[in-house]
Swiss-Prot record:
The gene is cry9Aa. This is Pesticidal crystal protein Cry9Aa. Belongs to the delta endotoxin family. Keywords: Sporulation, Toxin, Virulence. InterPro entries: Cry1Ac-like_dom-VII (IPR048645), Cry_V (IPR041587), Galactose-bd-like_sf (IPR008979), Pest_crys (IPR038979), Pest_crys_dom-III (IPR005638), Pest_crys_dom_I (IPR005639), Pest_crys_N_sf (IPR036716), Pest_cryst_cen_dom_sf (IPR036399). Toxic segment of the protein is located in the N-terminus.
Length: 1156
């Protein structure tokens, strides 16, 4: 996910473990890394405020993957998710492990108290242990696919090696005798590594407890009770992580009273929550004793990002809001963080607006900014609304939609470095809200003097698979907004200098309390919509993943609204996770009546809350709900006072009824038999991947108790069919596990593409293409490399469309095959019969699908009717696969209309067979024509390429493009850029993002141009001298503006009293050249003046009738370049631009050192 400047981790050479790796895991460890401490330590707050650290970015993705892992429905699904998790932990897209990244991030706020070798050893051991776990996972995957004595033996061996290594480096969470991840004085720096390693160890032990008997793990001597070890280590690892988190927390809290001290403390709390506490919160759900099946896990904690206020990214340019002179302080900032409160959901915000003024002119609004908030929130499954109030409220208000906001772009303003506010905010909503954006709009005065400066600050937590979240890929949503002063001095009476802070909850915290009939549903009790009198919310002790409910006497805990799937007539068992200093009786009431359970005390009064303080207790009586939504009331009895009862969550465990029948078995047998040839060694010619998945659905629906043997045999057969289907599929990642990866091939997609999983239509994943946005189509595509293809061969693209409108399917080789699908949503009804599997009776559903498909297969159709079929096939033929150009096959799916859409899956590209006869002759003729046209295009491209290359060569003085020609200016770079832009066939005409035949040379030249632009900007002592960033870094009066012509920006002085100026620094006593490219429009003169502190001055004058530096006479409306040599005697310099009349256009201003 992140891009990082620190140490690089190498990748292993193969995905399998050799015997040497297994025996000597850390010898020549390919995942070892040496930290670059100089780049990690003492990072200025200016470099990280309002920015999520690199390690925390990865941790957000890792934490979300862990949530998915806990809900994994099968061993196969679990293995796939864990492979993904390992990739993120060992490197992600940054190439660095979470161990490297977290240490570097923490060193920016925590003192280094150990030698670098201790940290290097910890990183190496962490990476090595995860590598050993991956070796174990490979053996588990092999055993799962082919369980036999050999695979079981290999699995046991690798399990024991990994288990021993985790024991060595984690030392059972000892606080006094730590292993390499718990060394003295390094515990806090290594804590994220410890938490991640502990999670993998617990996951390893969970597998042993669940599957170990089948491996023969428990036949060994001496006998080891891995279930007991798992339960014990969950507690030990939890307590260790919480202990050292709190140590760092308290150290930073005592560091000082300044705003800077608070920001460091706040960063620690936020990022260690993401890197450590979120992982720790999942530990309890790995206890196989309590969670033998998949579990819905929810994080209810709130992450508060840094306050939004104007920040000078250079300390030389002014005072930021947290500067000492502005009086923001630790206490006031910390007090603005809300106390624990209900886990409710944001509906909308009512934002109050007020003025920013100067004391000398209190009636003149310099800006109008965010003064206060009224967040309107609701409980889950409820229409009840209450308000959370912060800041100061005015009569000028704006109401902003608050549902499912995953990103906020704020504009902070600064008045004379003394008064602060937020004058604008754009709120990004997810796809369920139409991917819309809501805008709060204040006001910024832009005329006159003493106007505010503004700064854009983007606030979000990354998506699971993207640094910048999207409407489809995000991990957190906005839960609260807070307007605060933080102690800022108030320089103008009756006015408010303030900041804005955002709070975020994890997307796993569901807005609807839906009880799943197929897995355990955990619901944090902070989601109650009616809290009992006397109930308080208390802070997470560090391992809950959110706040707790507390009572000190008997009475109601509250009312929780839940949604049951009543059509299933499902039964559930109920249990709670709680801690109590006294014996209690808990009653639960709902449409099912009232059930009660005695709960014993778990802790002593006055003790700190630890993992062992909590117990999970199940009610003896199951329930069968009769209403949905239902109101669940929880009450604590009998009478007591001055005790402590804490309740974390309530859980619903489904009681699975028998739901199979003989006809389901017969339908499954028929579906499986239809997949194979008579000899059963291959798939029938016309069988598509969709048919294999649907047959597997029918088999999975069968009862293990009644049809265990039949189901086993059918599963083996259908798995064989699926393997055959996957083996022949030339498309990579047909399950859409990774989209827009950094790999060369694989799926690439635009915004508006989402992945859906489950449901009645697809066994695996499907893709959904939303409607296009104006001129931006929604698309997903993949290239099959030419090395995977055979010359003069026919290939077929297959898939299944649930429904679509204006779906275009293109197959491109050296020609294009185009298909349009408008498929009605006509397969099954919206209601599903009782006794269904996973909420859907898949056996009956498949019968309905089959009936519709039979009609499509046997009914004669015209072209319009064919476009409406759910299944599709498209054919394309290859030519001679000329090695001089990559002639792979592109498979493209796109929607270009604003009312189009599509849901499709089971995509495969398969070889049909070699061409022959007329088909072969036709392809040979087409291939000859295509080769001739390619030669013509290449000749034309080569001419343009040579001209562009020569122009770019002129920009540099060396072959490595590391030094710019001192004689060139921006005009030379623009001339070269225009030549590069004239190169054709850079991208495909089907989808702009697909490379064309000239993509590589275009990219080569563009990269060199980019280097030239970078060097041009770097050498210029004048900031923003090309005005590409508007008037940033310039002091400008009215009448000065920046305009744009194509890719060129230029300064315009439109009146004789307009002026811009800038102060900058140089090396004194060096030779510099002032070079200006400008044009004078109309009468009068334009001036660019340079001066130093010693009052040495030089001026370049421009008028409508002038000569350029080459002596060429120019006329009005022509840009020319002038230059003058200057030897500054002081460090500080000023440049000023003005004119006498008419208009003055300045393309660029350079002040470049030419000689030391």
């Amino acid at each position: 996910m992140n891009q990082n400047k620190h140490g690089i981790i190498g990748a292993s050479n193969c995905g399998c473990a050799s015997d040497d790796v297994a025996k000597y895991p850390l010898a020549n460890n390919p995942y070892s890394s040496a930290l670059n401490l100089n780049s990690c330590q003492n990072s200025s707050i200016l470099n990280w405020i309002n920015i999520i650290g690199d390690a925390a970015k990865e941790a957000v993705s890792i934490g979300t993957t862990i949530v998915s892992l806990i809900t994994a429905p099968s061993l196969t699904g679990l293995i796939s998710i864990v492979y993904d998790l390992i990739g993120k932990v060992l490197g992600g897209s940054s190439g660095q492990s979470i161990s490297d990244l977290s240490i570097c991030d923490l060193l920016s706020i925590i003192d280094l108290r150990v030698s670098q070798s201790v940290l290097n050893d910890g990183i190496a051991d962490f990476n090595g242990s995860v590598l050993l776990y991956r070796n174990y996972l490979e053996a588990l995957d092999s055993w799962n696919k082919n369980p036999n004595s050999a695979s079981a033996e290999e699995l046991r061996t690798r399990f024991r090696i990994a288990d021993s290594e985790f024991d060595r480096i984690l030392t059972r969470g000892s606080l006094t005798n730590g292993g390499s991840l718990a060394r003295q004085n390094a515990q806090i720096l290594l804590l994220p590594s410890f938490a991640s390693a502990a999670f993998f160890h617990l996951l390893l032990l969970r597998d042993a407890t669940r599957y170990g008997t089948n491996w023969g793990l428990y036949n060994a001597t001496p006998f080891i009770n891995y279930q007991s070890k798992l339960v014990e280590l969950i507690e030990l690892y939890t307590d260790y992580c919480v202990h050292w988190y709190n140590r760092g927390f308290n150290e930073l809290r005592q560091r000082g009273t300044s705003a800077t001290a608070w920001l460091e403390f706040h960063r620690y709390r936020r990022e260690m929550t993401l890197m450590v506490l979120d992982i720790v919160a999942s530990f309890s759900s790995l206890d196989i004793t309590n969670y033998p099946i998949e579990t819905d896990f929810q994080l209810s904690r709130v992450i508060y990002t840094d306050p939004i206020g104007f920040v000078h990214r250079s300390s030389l340019r002014g005072e930021s809001w947290f500067s000492f002179v502005n009086r923001a302080n630790f206490s006031d900032l910390e007090n603005a963080i809300p106390n624990p409160r209900p886990s409710w959901f944001l509906n909308n915000m009512i934002i109050s607006t007020g003025s920013l003024t100067l004391p000398v002119s209190p009636s003149t609004d310099r800006a109008r900014v965010w003064y206060g908030s009224r967040d309107r929130i609701s409980p889950a499954n409820s229409q009840f609304i209450t308000e959370l109030i912060s800041g100061q409220h005015t009569t000028a208000t704006q109401t902003i939609l608050g549902r499912n906001i995953f990103r906020v772009d704020s504009q902070a303003c600064n008045l004379n470095d003394t008064t602060y506010g937020v004058n604008r905010a754009v709120f990004y909503h997810d796809a369920s809200e139409g991917s819309q954006r809501s805008v709060y709009e204040g006001y910024i005065r832009t005329t006159g003097i003493d106007n505010p400066r503004v700064q854009n600050i983007n606030t979000y937590l990354p998506g699971e698979n993207s640094d910048i979240p999207t409407p489809e890929d995000y991990t957190h949503i906005l839960s609260t907004t807070i307007n605060l002063t933080g102690g800022l001095r108030q320089v103008a009476s009756n006015r408010r200098s303030s900041l804005v802070m955002y709070g975020w909850t994890h997307k796993s915290l569901a807005r609807n309390n839906t009880i799943n009939p197929d897995r355990i549903t955990q619901i944090p009790l902070t989601k109650v919509d009616t809290r009992g009198t006397g109930v308080s919310y208390v802070n997470d002790p560090g391992f809950i993943g959110g706040a707790l409910l507390q009572r000190t006497d008997h009475g109601s805990l509250g009312v929780l609204r839940v949604q049951f799937p009543l059509h299933l007539r499902q039964q559930y068992r109920i249990r709670v996770r709680y801690a109590s200093t006294t014996n209690i009786r808990l009653s639960v009431n709902g449409s099912f009546g009232t059930i009660s359970q005695n709960l014993p005390s778990t802790m002593r009064l006055g003790e700190d809350l630890r993992y062992g303080s909590f117990a999970i207790r199940e009610f003896n009586t199951s329930i069968r709900p009769t209403a949905s939504p239902d109101q669940i009331r929880l009450t604590i009895e009998p009478s007591f006072i001055r005790q402590e009862v804490y309740v974390d969550r309530i859980e619903f465990i489904p009681v699975n009824p028998t739901r199979e029948a003989k006809e389901d078995l017969e339908a499954a047998k028929k579906a499986v038999a239809s997949l194979f040839t008579r000899t059963r060694d291959g798939l029938q010619v016309n069988v598509k991947d969709y048919q294999v998945d649907q047959a597997a659905n029918l088999v999975s629906c069968l009862s293990d108790e009644q049809y265990g043997y039949d189901k086993k045999m059918l599963l083996e057969a259908v798995r064989a069919a699926k393997r055959l289907s996957r083996e022949r599929n030339l498309l990579q990642d047909p399950d859409f596990n990774t989209i827009n990866s950094t790999e060369e091939n694989g799926w690439k997609a635009s915004n508006g593409v989402t992945i859906s999983e489950g449901g009645p239509f697809y066994k695996g994943r499907a893709i959904q293409l939303a409607s296009a946005r104006e001129n931006y189509p929604t698309y997903i595509y993949q290239k099959v490399d030419a090395s995977e293809l055979k010359p003069y061969t026919r290939y077929r693209l297959d898939g299944f469309v649930k429904s679509s409108q204006d779906l275009e399917i293109d197959l491109i080789h050296h020609h294009k095959v185009h298909l349009v699908k408008n498929v009605p949503d006509n397969l099954v009804s919206d209601t599903y019969p009782d006794d269904s599997c996973s909420g859907i009776n898949r056996c009956q559903e498949q019968q309905m699908v089959n009936a519709q498909l039979e009609t499509e297969h046997h009914h004669p159709m015209d072209c319009c009717e064919a476009a409406q079929t759910h299944e599709f096939s498209s054919y394309i033929d290859t030519g001679d696969l000329n090695s001089s150009v990559d002639q792979g096959i592109w498979a493209i799916f796109k929607v270009r209309t604003t009312d189009g859409y599509a849901t499709l899956g089971n995509l495969e590209l398969v070889e049909v067979g070699p061409l022959s006869g007329e088909s072969l002759e036709r392809e040979q003729r087409d291939n000859t024509k295509w080769s001739a046209e390619l030669g013509r295009k290449r000749a034309e491209t080569d001419r343009v390429y040579q001209d562009a290359k020569q122009s770019i060569n002129h920009l540099f003085v060396d072959y490595q493009d590391q030094q710019l020609n001192p004689e060139i200016g921006m005009a030379d770079i623009m001339d070269a850029q225009n030549l590069v832009a004239s190169i054709s066939d850079v991208y495909s005409d089907a989808v702009l993002q697909i490379p064309g035949i000239n993509y590589e040379i275009y990219t080569e030249l563009s990269n060199r141009l980019q280097q030239a632009s970078y060097l041009y900007t770097s050498r210029n002592a004048v900031q923003n001298g090309d005005f590409n960033n508007g008037l940033d870094s310039w002091n400008a009066t009215a009448g000065a503006s920046v305009q744009q012509d194509g890719n060129t920006h230029f300064l315009v002085l439109s009146h004789w009293d307009a002026q811009v100026s800038q102060q900058f620094r140089v090396q004194p006593n060096c030779k510099y050249v002032l070079r200006v490219t400008a044009e004078k429009v109309g009468g009068g003169d334009g001036y660019v003046t340079i001066r130093d502190d010693a009052h040495h001055t030089e001026t370049l004058t421009f008028n409508a009738c002038d000569y350029d530096i080459n002596g060429t006479y120019v006329t009005d409306n022509t840009y020319l370049t002038k230059e003058v040599v200057f030897h500054p005697e002081t460090q500080h310099m000023w440049v000023e631009v003005n004119e006498t009349e008419g208009a003055f256009h300045i393309d660029s201003i350079e002040f470049v050192e030419t000689e030391k």
